Amino acid sequence: MTIAFQLAVFALIATSLILLISVPVVFASSDGWSSNKNIVFSGTSLWIGLVFLVAILNSLIS
């Protein structure tokens, strides 16, 4: 169970870093928002799901 928690935390951190870099780049590009809107929303949904997964796994471990 601890390994699953650690992998979920790592995935959350990696997703956060990817979104931290990619979202400003998408907004700064000329037509990036209209063509990459679905990717940004998918990444945000993944991030929210990982937050809940980490919270659930944390409650099971401690």
Curated annotation (Swiss-Prot):
One of its GO terms (biological process) is photosystem II stabilization. Keywords: Chloroplast, Membrane, Photosynthesis, Photosystem II, Plastid, Reaction center, Thylakoid, Transmembrane, Transmembrane helix. It is found in: Plastid, Chloroplast thylakoid membrane. The chain crosses the membrane at residues 8-28, 41-61. Coiled coil: none annotated. GO terms for cellular component: chloroplast thylakoid membrane; photosystem II reaction center. It is a multi-pass membrane protein. Its main location: plastid. NCBIfam families: PS_II_psbZ. Belongs to the PsbZ family. May control the interaction of photosystem II (PSII) cores with the light-harvesting antenna, regulates electron flow through the 2 photosystem reaction centers. PSII is a light-driven water plastoquinone oxidoreductase, using light energy to abstract electrons from H(2)O, generating a proton gradient subsequently used for ATP formation. PSII is composed of 1 copy each of membrane proteins PsbA, PsbB, PsbC, PsbD, PsbE, PsbF, PsbH, PsbI, PsbJ, PsbK, PsbL, PsbM, PsbT, PsbY, PsbZ, Psb30/Ycf12, at least 3 peripheral proteins of the oxygen-evolving complex and a large number of cofactors. It forms dimeric complexes. This is Photosystem II reaction center protein Z. It comes from Phalaenopsis aphrodite subsp. formosana (Moth orchid). The gene is psbZ.
